[in-house]
């Protein structure tokens, strides 16, 4: 695999690419990484690459030097990636996908960013390594190279290790142990010494689930959502219990009463209805009111009893034609969803 990195600081990459596993992979020919200076394509006598933006402060990389730099190395099957906090969040899945590319061009951002016209003309995808801003994109480019290199055959001494690392299967990796068998009174778990590979695999899976649930509940719920069995009929699903210590009533304006009632009947159960009034729990109720023009979306907040209810709710909502919105941040099980009329439901799960 070949990777070209475009930045204003090509020497930034020298040490990391000469040492550690990446350096060994490059020496062995499993990976080729080159860094080029965008200033080589600067304008005029002074090789200008930046200028002040029309609508803000600071400086921007100009479109022409960036476009020329990309086109000088781009090939027919190249994929150009811009490292940006606005891009798709880098994941193990995305790293594996990029590792299958024959040639990547990584564009590093500098200053306040890059002229949008250069991105529109040449960039295939934007990728972020996290919800924070760096002084430049060089560190992000190194993170991306390191993450995807692990999936290139020949880079790791033992390719199987990449398959068991944290996040590769959507879960955090469980605890690991080496000699001695007992350290400061704490022993290695007996199951790891039994020699039964199936028991060891089952144990690893269980502790991986427990650790993910404890430390990254967002990943835990995402894992169950993605791996839950395909549901053929809504009648096969048990009722989802809504937690509501307080009494409240909500009126939802809908354009098609029959269609909306069918949607919510399948979501919460036909037995919950009394005319056009839906009882979510106890005295908590939802009224549907048909109108030609709605006054805008209503926001409904509900809390579910268990993680599995949370996952089932999202799966059922999507299957019935509802739209899934943004996932909550900070690892808290929270999701915004939209019904058929655009009303907003903020769904969360009881924290135990």
Curated annotation (Swiss-Prot):
Report whether Phosphoprotein shows up as a keyword of the record: no
Give any GO molecular function from the UniProt entry.
tRNA (guanine(37)-N1)-methyltransferase activity
Question: What PANTHER family does the entry give?
Answer: TRNA (GUANINE-N(1)-)-METHYLTRANSFERASE (PTHR46417:SF1)
Q: Where does S-adenosyl-L-methionine bind?
A: 109, 129-134
What is the top-level taxon of the source organism?
Bacteria
What name does the UniProt record give this protein?
tRNA (guanine-N(1)-)-methyltransferase
Localization of this protein:
Cytoplasm
User: Among its keywords, does the record have S-adenosyl-L-methionine?
Assistant: yes
Q: Which GO terms describe its biological process?
A: tRNA N1-guanine methylation
Q: What does this protein do?
A: Specifically methylates guanosine-37 in various tRNAs.
Q: Under the cellular component aspect of Gene Ontology, which terms does the record hold?
A: cytosol
Provide the alphabetized UniProt keywords.
Cytoplasm, Methyltransferase, S-adenosyl-L-methionine, Transferase, tRNA processing
Which organism is this entry from? Chlamydia trachomatis serovar A (strain ATCC VR-571B / DSM 19440 / HAR-13)
Gene3D superfamilies the record matches: 2,3-Dihydroxybiphenyl 1,2-Dioxygenase, domain 1, 3.40.1280.10, tRNA(m1g37)methyltransferase, domain 2
* Quaternary assembly: Homodimer.
- Which reactions appear under catalytic activity for this entry? guanosine(37) in tRNA + S-adenosyl-L-methionine = N(1)-methylguanosine(37) in tRNA + S-adenosyl-L-homocysteine + H(+)
A Pfam family for this UniProt protein?
Answer: tRNA_m1G_MT
**UniProt enzyme class:** transferase
- EC number(s) given by UniProt: 2.1.1.228
The family line of this record is: Belongs to the RNA methyltransferase TrmD family.
């Amino acid at each position: 695999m070949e990777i070209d990195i475009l930045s204003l600081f090509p020497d930034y990459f020298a040490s990391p690419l000469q040492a550690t596993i990446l350096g060994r992979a490059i020496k062995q020919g499993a990976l080729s990484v080159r860094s080029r200076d965008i200033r080589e394509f600067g304008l005029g006598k002074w090789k200008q690459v930046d200028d002040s933006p029309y609508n803000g402060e600071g400086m921007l990389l100009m479109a022409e030097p960036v476009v020329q730099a990309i086109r000088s190395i781009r090939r027919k099957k190249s994929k150009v990636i811009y490292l940006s906090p606005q891009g798709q969040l880098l994941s193990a899945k995305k790293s594996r996908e990029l590792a299958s590319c024959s040639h990547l061009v990584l564009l590093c951002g500098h200053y306040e960013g890059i002229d949008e016209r250069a991105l529109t003309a040449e960039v295939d995808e934007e990728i972020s390594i996290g919800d924070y801003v760096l002084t430049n994109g060089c560190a992000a480019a190194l993170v991306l190279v390191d993450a995807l290199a692990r999936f290139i055959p020949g880079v790791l001494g033992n390719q199987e290790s990449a398959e068991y690392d944290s996040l590769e299967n959507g879960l955090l990796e469980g605890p690991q142990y080496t000699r001695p068998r007992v350290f400061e009174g704490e022993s290695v778990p007996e199951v790891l010494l039994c020699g039964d590979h199936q028991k060891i695999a089952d144990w690893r899976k269980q502790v991986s689930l427990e650790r993910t649930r404890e430390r990254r509940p967002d990943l835990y719920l995402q894992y169950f959502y993605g791996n839950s069995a395909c549901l053929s009929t809504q009648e096969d699903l048990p009722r989802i219990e809504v937690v509501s210590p307080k009494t409240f009533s909500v009126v939802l304006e809908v354009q098609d009463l029959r269609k909306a009632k069918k949607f919510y009947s399948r979501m919460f159960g036909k037995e919950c209805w009394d005319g056009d009034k839906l009882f979510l729990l106890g005295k908590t109720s939802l009224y549907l009111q048909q109108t030609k023009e709605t006054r805008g979306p209503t926001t409904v907040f509900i809390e579910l009893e268990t993680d599995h209810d949370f996952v089932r709710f999202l799966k059922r909502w999507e299957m019935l034609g509802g739209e899934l919105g943004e996932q909550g941040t900070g690892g808290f099980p929270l999701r915004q969803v939209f019904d058929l009329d655009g009303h907003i439901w903020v769904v969360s799960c009881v924290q135990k």
